[in-house]
Every structure is written in structure tokens, then in C-alpha cells.
Amino acid sequence: MAVVTIRQLLDCGVHFGHPKTRWNPKMKRFIFTERSGIYIIDLQQSLALIDKAYDFVKETVAHGGTILFVGTKKQAQESIAEQAQRVGQPYVNQRWLGGLLTNFQTVHKRLNRLKELDLVDFDDTTRGFTKKELLIQRRERDKLEKSLGGIRNLTKTPSAMWVVDTKKEHLAIDEARKLGIPVIGILDTNCDPDEVQYPIPGNDDAIRSVALLTRIIADAAAEGLIQRHQKPDAEGSAPAEPLADWERELLEQGDAAKAALPVEENDVDAEVSAKNEAKSDDEVPAPVHAPESDDATEAKIEAEATEAEAAPATTGPVSE
């Protein structure tokens, strides 16, 4: 079942692209037609790619991963914060700080500082701080809250990243590519589809379009959270994150080779054992005589004993 219909995409204006003068030739395969100098995006392809991205996000979250929502343009700030908070995922809807992913250790120290300042009562002057010092700390906290408030609970780099407007968020995409973090993003007709692993062709400028696509990704994360909590955790181990494509292929090849080896051995063993049984049946000689009864055996023993008694005993040394 599709997570969204073409009618919903049309109503939100997802199909509207940029004017012909602002386009990337790499997006040609996603363009349906051109009307009044504006490119129209092929929503059939968008629908299929939405389903693919939805499944990826759901599986990522179900296996314990996190999705970082990124959208700093005005049209996306509200929906990014709202949907990310709804499903408990980190988000960045203000300015992207350089090194937020590639220099996460330093960012994590600032997050700890933010948590320390959250515990400070700025109206209490009886703790040894002057009013000026409390005012400076309050301003520091407000600044950190604005820039890092959305990722305060992020303890490691995210498993994947949802991006609105890949051209504007090029710094975030560059850092994600350096760390091998998959990117799901809205691709307008002026974007480069090679920059993201899970592209969704659509309008990244209209508020309704951005809100709809962001809500779909959040719904996928919510479904993944439900699956994560429903999974029995008998061993008490932390859920594993999804494997990379090359790791998955390597694992499948190893499983296939391991499964094929016992089957071949079993076939050979069965064939050899069948031959041995047939050969043993042919080589077993027929019995020469029937086994003697107990009475016949006793009579034979008595006869041998009588013959031994009747034989003369030898006395003295035997002459040479």
C-alpha cells in the first residue's frame, strides 16, 4: 500500500519545479514536461522513490538507528522541528554548524555544557554568582539552545539524514558523505541527484510540499519505533543497525556458500553409504553348514574326552 497518493502530491504542489533557466541537466530523467516556462516533475517516479525512502527509514529506526532532520530555510523550519519532535528524532532547523558531524566530539562537549546550564537557576543570586554573571550564563544558554537545542539528546553521529533543499544544505551533505551517512532528500529541478542516496523528486520551496514530505519521513520513523519496541529482546542485546550494501552482499554470499556445502557432503555420503551397503551384501559368503545344536556340541566334547582317556600315557624319557 502506498504511503501517499498522487492526488495528495498534486494538492500540495510537489510537482512544480524551477523555471527552465534554473535547472540541473542531471534531473532530466525526473522531469515530466514543461508548462509556461516551469518544469513539471514526474510524480510517478516520485511516488516510487517515496516508498523506497519510507522503507529505508522504517528499517533504520527499527534496528536502533536515528534520523537527523535538517532544514534551515524558512519554509522548512517549522515542519522540521514539529515532525522531528513528534517522533523523538534530532533536528537542525537553524544555521548548520560546520563540523557538526565530522567534529562531533567537540560538539558533544558543547551539548554537555548546554545540559549544565539547563540546571542553573538564573534568578537565584544566593549561589555565589552576581547578576552580571548570571546574565552572561543565560545568554550563553540561549545561544546554545538556538544552535544545538534540536540535537541535545544526540550521543553519536546519526544513522541517516533527511534534508530539505540539498543545494542550501550542501555543508551538511558534504559532512554526511565523508562519514558514509546515507542521505534522504527532496530534489528540485535545480539539484544534483548524485549527492543523495535516496532522492525524492519534488518541490522544496513550497511550505505544503515540504510539510507533506517531512511528515511522510516522520511517519516512517514512527512505524520503525513501533517495530523496535515490539521486537522481543530475549538476549538483552542492543538492536543492530542495518548493514551497508557491500556488507549485506558479503554476508549473503557467505551464507549461501555455507548452506551449499553441507548439502553436497550429505549427497556424497548418502551415495557412498549406499554403494558400501550393496557391496557388503554381495560379499557376505553363504554359511557352509548350519550351526550345531547344544546336544551335538556336548556329545562331541564327551567323545574327545573318552579318546584322551583311552590313549596310553607315556612314561619316562623319550629315547632319541
Curated annotation (Swiss-Prot):
Keywords, sorted A to Z? Ribonucleoprotein, Ribosomal protein
Cellular component annotations (GO), alphabetically ordered: cytosolic small ribosomal subunit
Task: Give the Low complexity compositional bias ranges.
Answer: 308-320
Family annotation (Gene3D superfamilies) = Glucose-6-phosphate isomerase like protein, domain 1, Helix hairpin bin
Which SUPFAM superfamilies does the entry link to? Ribosomal protein S2
Give start-end positions of Basic and acidic residues composition bias. 272-282
What's one Pfam family the UniProt record gives for this protein?
Answer: Ribosomal_S2
Could you identify this protein by its name?
A: Small ribosomal subunit protein uS2
Q: Which organism is it from?
A: Clavibacter sepedonicus
